[in-house]
């Protein structure tokens, strides 16, 4: 075995074959970092047949003017069941970064620690407890089992829907009542989904602005999304949910015709048997449905007059690799939330994953606080409703490479606080 630099193709070919390969460890992210001017390294291990058997993207930024801080975001991509390989990689990684005047190194492996449900109850251990002792023996210090959202540390909890051996109908059956109703509702409401082009990204950004204001969270800058759309290429999809009013109004009119037939039948039943309580109840129920239907028709006609035939209502930002579809961000028009556009977006992308043989649909980060007072309690409830599971990852590890200077660096940081 040898630790070596990799070409972009070697790196990409390997990471695309591996499970637990995060989108930050793919060629598109390497191209993005290079374009941003970030010092970037592709490194890995090759066996005696010159085959890549481990890989990671490393970035380096200046620290204290003369040193560098190295970071592997969700790396390395490696078979963690091969403990000998893991030991060799992390040992050689320290030697590699030392050659580049590294002050300290941070890694946060995309490695599950344990599995939970959305009540926070542990449902299983991932079998990777040994990694803590292994990395400690190599000089890496674990940063703790943090919860919540941190500007430096990667989120430790993901909400993940397993799609292995499931059809779209299986997924629908396993949803809770609200998710099931809203997923069916968007079909009736004439909500369609298409993918946005780069020129149309401002539509997505406007929805994110709406959502961040309503839910009071800090969104990323426009450049974050635009740059990833550009460099990740076909690994990014931005589905837009919209209403086609011609089709929607036609569906509502068809529904009205059916309701009118049923209503006339109920009237005839009452004529024949005025004492028929069931027919009277049916008549009242149909009158309510007809009234609701007419309100929808009126609303649709007014909105069509205001916006034209198509009205965008929701959009999401998804990052895809062969291992998983990641729901990174999403936003909805506050004014048209009642059309449930976000459910159309999710349903479209769940079907995309199934159709492309991708077994993992990642709703992405949650805080790890499962109480009703959690800052993301509503988000947790939404993701739970799709019958997703929670994966807790092992967390961050730091290794000082130049220990004396790292201690000085930490002291200076404390003094600045």
From Swiss-Prot:
GO annotations of cellular component type: cytoplasm
Q: Which UniProt keywords apply?
A: Acyltransferase, Cell shape, Cell wall biogenesis/degradation, Cytoplasm, Peptidoglycan synthesis, Transferase
Q: What job does the chain carry out?
A: Catalyzes the incorporation of amino acid(s) into the interchain peptide bridge of peptidoglycan, using aminoacyl-tRNA as amino acid donor.
What SUPFAM superfamilies does the annotation carry?
A: Acyl-CoA N-acyltransferases (Nat), tRNA-binding arm
One Gene Ontology molecular-function label: nucleotide binding
Q: Does the keyword Hydrolase apply?
A: no
Q: Which gene does this sequence derive from?
A: femA
What's the protein name? Aminoacyltransferase FemA
Q: Which source organism?
A: Staphylococcus epidermidis (strain ATCC 35984 / DSM 28319 / BCRC 17069 / CCUG 31568 / BM 3577 / RP62A)
What's the family? Belongs to the FemABX family.
The UniProt record lists the EC number as 2.3.2.17
* One GO-annotated biological process of the protein: cell wall organization
């Amino acid at each position: 075995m040898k630790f070596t630099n990799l070409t972009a193709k070697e790196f990409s070919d390997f990471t695309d074959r591996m499970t637990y390969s995060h989108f930050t460890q793919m060629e598109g992210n390497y191209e993005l970092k290079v374009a941003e001017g970030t010092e970037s390294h592709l490194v890995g291990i090759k066996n005696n047949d010159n085959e890549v058997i481990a890989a990671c993207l490393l970035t380096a930024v200046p620290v204290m003017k003369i040193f560098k801080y190295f970071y592997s975001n969700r790396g390395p991509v490696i078979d963690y069941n091969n403990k000998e390989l893991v030991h060799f990689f992390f040992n050689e990684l320290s030697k590699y970064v030392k050659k580049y005047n590294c002050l300290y190194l941070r890694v946060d492996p995309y490695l599950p620690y344990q599995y939970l449900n959305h009540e926070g109850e542990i449902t299983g251990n991932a079998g990777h407890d040994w990694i803590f002792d292994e990395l400690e023996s190599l000089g890496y210090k674990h940063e703790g089992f943090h919860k919540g959202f941190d500007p430096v540390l990667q989120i430790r909890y993901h909400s993940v829907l397993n799609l292995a051996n499931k059809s779209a109908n299986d997924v629908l059956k396993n949803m809770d009542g609200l998710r099931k109703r809203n997923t069916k509702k968007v079909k009736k409401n004439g909500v369609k989904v298409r993918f946005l082009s780069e020129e149309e990204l401002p539509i997505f950004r406007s929805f994110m602005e709406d959502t961040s204001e309503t839910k009071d969270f800090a969104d990323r800058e426009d450049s974050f999304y635009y740059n990833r759309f550009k460099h990740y290429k076909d690994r990014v999809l931005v589905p837009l949910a919209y209403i086609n009013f011609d089709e929607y109004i036609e569906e509502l009119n068809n529904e009205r015709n059916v309701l009118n037939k049923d209503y006339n039948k109920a009237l005839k039943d009452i004529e024949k048997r005025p004492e028929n309580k069931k027919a009277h109840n049916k008549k009242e129920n149909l009158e309510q449905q007809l009234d609701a239907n007419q309100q929808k028709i009126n609303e649709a006609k007014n909105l069509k007059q205001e916006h034209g035939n198509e009205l965008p209502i929701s959009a999401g930002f998804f990052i895809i690799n062969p291992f998983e579809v990641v729901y990174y961000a999403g936003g909805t028009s506050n004014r048209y939330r009642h059309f449930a556009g976000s459910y159309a977006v999710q349903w479209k992308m769940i079907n995309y994953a199934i159709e492309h043989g991708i077994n993992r649909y990642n709703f992405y980060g949650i805080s790890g606080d499962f109480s009703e007072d959690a800052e993301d309690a509503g988000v947790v409830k939404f993701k739970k409703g799709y019958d997703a599971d929670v994966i807790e990852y092992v967390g961050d590890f730091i290794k000082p490479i130049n220990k004396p200077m790292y201690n000085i660096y930490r002291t200076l940081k404390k003094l600045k606080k």
